[in-house]
Design a protein with these regions (language model features):
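Conserved alpha-helical segments that form or flank metal/cofactor-binding pockets of metalloenzymes
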Residues: 2-8, 72-99, 166-174
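Carboxylate-rich helix-loop segments that flank metal/cofactor sites and access channels
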Residues: 8-21, 90-112, 126-134, 184-198
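Acidic/His metal-coordination segments adjacent to aromatic residues that form catalytic metal sites
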Residues: 18-40, 101-126, 143-148, 194-204
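Alpha-helical bundle segments that constitute or directly flank the non-heme di-iron/ferroxidase center
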Residues: 24-58, 74-77, 81, 117-143
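Alpha-helical scaffold segments that form or flank carboxylate-/histidine-based iron centers
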Residues: 31-40, 62-77, 115-123, 148-162, ...
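Hydrophobic, aromatic-enriched interface-forming segments
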Residues: 129-132, 141-180
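Primarily interfacial, aromatic-capped hydrophobic alpha-helices that serve as membrane anchors
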Residues: 192-218
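Conserved small/polar residues in nucleotide/adenosyl-binding loops
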Residues: 243-245
């Protein structure tokens, strides 16, 4: 097994009542990028839990069994908190259910037609991606959310810490209970990375159009440069992303 970090479920509370629309340093792109992630988290977390639960009874190692239970607790709490923030986005004019309808359809079709082993492998890949984002959130004293609204900064930092804590649980279950396999692991990470960028990019652009910012190239260029420039918040995470392959 690869997991040695203690997984500690927490139940924090965040006051999201006064979160502004552009809560991350007043930057529309920086804000909506993380909004586009958040809006998918509740359904994504439930997908991850079910994918691991499919193999839970095949795990015999006591430490991993305990890690699985704490993984479930952490992921369930993530879903609850991001549902709360999604309600804030709804009140600010984002039609949450409409935005995530295709994502929900993708999950239903995947669970119906794909093998349980590949669903677990996809979960391990997505967990790697979210853990990399979590490590990025903590990098440089929290530079990713340095000037964010305090409650949003606390929410994403808490989520990031827990993603790092349980980052290898799905992978350990995949290796010990599902038989592992390099090819499917590598392909799942590649497909998962492309899927995350496609889905998040599409929703990000949809939100920016709702904000009527598609006609403000300087605002958009500044925000995307902060994410994907040579030292962008996402660009600098690429080396960490490749470790899983």
């Amino acid at each position: 097994m690869t997991h040695m970090i203690n997984i500690q479920p927490r139940k924090p509370r965040f006051d999201l009542s006064d979160v502004p629309v552009f809560w991350n340093d007043g930057d529309p792109v920086l804000t909506r990028f993380f909004d586009a992630l958040s809006i998918h988290f509740p359904d994504g977390e439930r997908f991850f839990i079910q994918s691991v639960r499919n193999y839970q009874d095949l795990v015999t190692d006591p430490k991993l069994r305990e890690d699985i239970k704490n993984f479930f607790r952490q992921e369930a709490q993530h879903g609850i908190v991001h549902d709360q923030y999604n309600a804030v986005m709804q009140s600010q004019g984002i039609h949450v259910e409409k935005v995530i309808a295709r994502f929900k359809l993708f999950i239903r079709h995947s669970q119906k037609h794909l093998p349980a082993k590949y669903l677990l492998d996809m979960t391990a890949a997505f967990e790697h991606i979210t853990a990399v984002l979590g490590e990025g959130a903590m990098e440089g004293e929290g530079e990713m959310f340095k000037n964010a609204h305090p409650a949003m900064r606390a929410m994403f930092m808490w989520h990031g810490v827990e993603e790092v804590e349980h980052k290898t649980v799905a992978f350990d279950v995949y290796e010990t209970a599902a038989g592992g396999g390099y090819f499917t692991r590598a392909s799942a990470l590649i497909i998962g990375t492309l899927l995350v960028h496609a889905v998040v990019g599409s929703v990000l652009w949809h939100m920016l159009k709702i904000d009527k910012l598609q006609g403000q190239p300087l605002v958009l260029a500044k925000g995307f440069y902060r994410l994907y420039g040579p030292r962008g918040l996402i660009t600098r995470l690429i080396p960490l992303s490749l470790i899983h392959i």
